[in-house]
């Protein structure tokens, strides 16, 4: 595996009128493993993902993926380079089966597209068969293959999150962006998803996640960067982040820091 970073932010800024959401952000996501980006509400974390996936242009600096500058690329073009994303708000097709949901995720890599696959015309049957086999395999990775024919709306909240993971993987990415993957989950669902993300990472995918649940992040990520008021204020492993005074202050302020600090940062949370 190359030592070169998979994703690089080099002096990236993003302004909305006079509002500076990101300022001179330098960030490197290494190949392999699980990288976390954390920070207080309004720090600019989601903007980092929106810039990476082409939903917004940068105001300054550059973003490179595998050495390629992403400037000017449309979201679907960025997907084809090998970047996939899930969103904080679940976006599954609730009236479609799990299998169909995952097959739709394959459209950018199929000769006939998703509509052709779902139409099951004779011209598309060979490709459809391969796509269905791959979709079932991806569902098995998140332990949903036994529900492949079920309607997505009948899944639990946690299962819909896992379906989103499978659909994102269907685009054949190298880099998987997870936007608050455990938002709204209970403790058991979080533990289950942590296992699935570790399994995905072990298969060779690079995972880059934004998450507010500090225990989840500290228990899962090998590398973490902290964003505050649009600037990176700390980077390192969980132990470094947990004990960095700048990070504690960013989350709590000086007065609360002096009163004892944040338990999730200090204890490190789930293992």
Across the structure, where does each feature detected by a protein language model lie?
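Glycine-rich phosphate-binding loops of nucleotide-dependent enzymes
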Residues: 2-271
